[in-house]
Amino acid sequence: MGFLSKILDGNNKEIKQLGKLADKVIALEEKTAILTDEEIRNKTKQFQTELADIDNVKKQNDYLDKILPEAYALVREGSKRVFNMTPYKVQIMGGIAIHKGDIAEMRTGEGKTLTATMPTYLNALAGRGVHVITVNEYLSSVQSEEMAELYNFLGLTVGLNLNSKTTEEKREAYAQDITYSTNNELGFDYLRDNMVNYSEDRVMRPLHFAIIDEVDSILIDEARTPLIISGEAEKSTSLYTQANVFAKMLKQDEDYKYDEKTKSVHLTEQGADKAERMFKVENLYDVQNVDVISHINTALRAHVTLQRDVDYMVVDGEVLIVDQFTGRTMPGRRFSEGLHQAIEAKEGVQIQNESKTMASITFQNYFRMYNKLAGMTGTAKTEEEEFRNIYNMTVTQIPTNKPVQRNDKSDLIYISQKGKFDAVVEDVVEKHKAGQPVLLGTVAVETSEYISNLLKKRGIRHDVLNAKNHEREAEIVAGAGQKGAVTIATNMAGRGTDIKLGEGVEELGGLAVIGTERHESRRIDDQLRGRSGRQGDKGDSRFYLSLQDELMIRFGSERLQKMMSRLGLDDSTPIESKMVSRAVESAQKRVEGNNFDARKRILEYDEVLRKQREIIYNERNSIIDEEDSSQVVDAMLRSTLQRSINYYINTADDEPEYQPFIDYINDIFLQEGDITEDDIKGKDAEDIFEVVWAKIEAAYQSQKDILEEQMNEFERMILLRSIDSHWTDHIDTMDQLRQGIHLRSYAQQNPLRDYQNEGHELFDIMMQNIEEDTCKFILKSVVQVEDNIEREKTTEFGEAKHVSAEDGKEKVKPKPIVKGDQVGRNDDCPCGSGKKFKNCHGK
């Protein structure tokens, strides 16, 4: 209890401080009101000029803190003149919390959009760009258009970044003082910027300050979904079809086991026997059958754990993922690890080729790159620990401008879903007769359509808002508060759009919100409730539950069922109990805790790839931005030569074997015959380096003489292609490592530590391979002067072909690996089986 009171005291103390600063802003109202429009714009110019003279971000932030009251007062006055709306004190307080890099939790209808204008204006003065982020492109478009009036009045520029825009249009949007965009588009633009070949092809500026609307949706709900840019991998789809046919034949408990709580599914011994007969293999779990078992497991997941119209939808022959938190489809997103292909096989649509990841990043890692990050939402307090631990953001609950009058009624619990839905329909019919508008919230598209059919049978006119008709979202939400309106909505419930009450609705009790099921996250339930009772309006909310709801099944509805049977309750009689409501909330807390742990675990694993990504992207960018890349090439030539000497030459031996070293030098650096055993015999490692280096330098100079001024362009092209090719393969290898690493825990090993160590080794090997390839292609490529190497356009993602190199004679050429005699996981096994080491003696 002490911990809770500390948090509450902390919030109260914070609110007092925000209130004092807000009063300073309000105190400047009269002084600002006498300024002309031109004088207001001149103030903006003055601030910008003073900030431009400060080159340090921290000092700029100190200056912004100093001018905050005056800047916020200017925005208030501008808002009054442009929109005829003056931000309230609580909105100023929310704006101050955002400027501090925190999350302002503000109830629905409290004017978050207007609140954000103050910190956006203030931080845009620094000239480093402010990103205002919304959950969809519709909201970005609407808000940028509306708010541009205010920002332009104040003397700032506004850009809108959409998926459909060209590279030039995107660059222009990012160059403005303020840029509106979705989180997805920002992430993809960042990845694309790190795949270009020339600096002028980039569209973004360095990441400075971001304000995220519906911050919980983006930083919590979508945190586990990585953004991926991929190219097609060549792979047959026939195994998906076979696995799908097999999965259809299986029976639960006999052939496979399914755990409802963890949503995991696996074959029984009997199921494995059937698989061996069906796929004509002797031992299903033999390493050579890893593809077969992988496809079977994926097909089982597609059939058993994922439901059509709940987890995904099929639209025009295409499988679209449904976002579990918003109810919207996510075009362009695909399940990974072959799961999407397994669903396509299940639904009988065309199976797309598997894709190969070329670049990826999670929102957790993308947003942590900003100098300052802030957000706003109606529901964030339940996830405060996660915001603090992962993003270093505090959640500040901003008071409402008017007291909340909504009546949140106790949950009603029924034995069956039929009893629950019958009661829901009766409640809707009763309220509809009185003219009170009703918003029905559902967890899945399937449920919204089922209730819609029940209401049609009763002759109740209504609108359905789900992933199938999201185009009319704004129109449906706008009418949801009118007299007699009945609206069914999935979780999306029109986030970002207010439901305003029509004439005479206040007298009828305001908007009635009915939840047909509890979501696994309390925030989503709070969001649904929050649709009603905006800005002090009247309203009420109630959730109808059944013991057959997924959340209840997952967390022990058997005890409740027995209790209701003992009480002799039938299907039409609900129980209304604080104990049950507490049990439901406890189940939700457990799920939230599990989800937080999962996101934290993902971040720990992703941290390994984040550091590696940072090194690769920095390397790429320095190659692109440097006018001369010869220093990079020189360093690579030297380190590759030194590594090969360390690996092959053992001067302690009485009779060292020089031929493998010479073969390697011929393969990577020189033409055959350029170096002989006589050149290096009897010399120590240092002298050998000098002898060979002189020959390499001469070969390098020869290429420079042939290509002259085109040499730099040629080197850049080779460097970037080599980095991109190996980095893409490395991402794939790291993904494979991660998929199987959890099994290490059964051998009393620490999977995370193993992943970190092996990931580091794989990265070292990749860097060596990049250097080796670069050396080989720069020294051994045969380029004619008349080839006229042109600047290479950034090609379609996924394609990167090397300049053809002279191969010389066919022979076995060993590669130097720094780790002594250790063999890499993806190298051929030394036993000569032809398998990769990880699938043979490396198991």
UniProtKB/Swiss-Prot annotation:
Record-level GO cellular component terms: cell envelope Sec protein transport complex; cytosol; plasma membrane
Topological relation to the membrane, as annotated: Peripheral membrane protein
Subcellular localization(s) per the UniProt record: Cell membrane; Cytoplasm
UniProt binding sites for ATP: 91, 109-113, 498
Cysteines engaged in disulfide bonds, as pairs: none
MF-aspect GO terms: ATP binding; metal ion binding; protein-exporting ATPase activity
Binding positions (Zn(2+)): 829, 831, 840-841
Known cofactor(s): Zn(2+)
InterPro entries tied to this protein: Helicase_ATP-bd (IPR014001), Helicase_C-like (IPR001650), P-loop_NTPase (IPR027417), SEC_C_motif (IPR004027), SecA (IPR000185), SecA_CS (IPR020937), SecA_DEAD (IPR011115), SecA_motor_DEAD (IPR014018)
EC category name: translocase
Catalytic activity reported: ATP + H2O + cellular proteinSide 1 = ADP + phosphate + cellular proteinSide 2
Gene Ontology biological process: intracellular protein transmembrane transport; protein import; protein targeting; protein transport by the Sec complex
Keywords annotated in UniProt: ATP-binding, Cell membrane, Cytoplasm, Membrane, Metal-binding, Nucleotide-binding, Protein transport, Translocase, Translocation, Transport, Zinc
Residue numbers spanned by region Disordered: 799-826
Composition bias type Basic and acidic residues, residue spans: 799-813
Gene3D superfamilies for this protein: Helical scaffold and wing domains of SecA, P-loop containing nucleotide triphosphate hydrolases, SecA, preprotein cross-linking domain
Note on how the cofactor is bound: May bind 1 zinc ion per subunit.
Pfam families: P-loop_SecA, SEC-C, SecA_DEAD, SecA_PP_bind, SecA_SW
EC number: 7.4.2.8
Signal sequence coordinates: none
Family: Belongs to the SecA family.
Biological function: Part of the Sec protein translocase complex. Interacts with the SecYEG preprotein conducting channel. Has a central role in coupling the hydrolysis of ATP to the transfer of proteins into and across the cell membrane, serving as an ATP-driven molecular motor driving the stepwise translocation of polypeptide chains across the membrane.
PANTHER family: CHLOROPLAST PROTEIN-TRANSPORTING ATPASE (PTHR30612:SF0), SECA INNER MEMBRANE COMPONENT OF SEC PROTEIN SECRETION SYSTEM (PTHR30612)
Self-association and partners: Monomer and homodimer. Part of the essential Sec protein translocation apparatus which comprises SecA, SecYEG and auxiliary proteins SecDF. Other proteins may also be involved.
Protein name: Protein translocase subunit SecA 1
Native species: Staphylococcus aureus (strain MRSA252)
Recorded name of the encoding gene: secA1
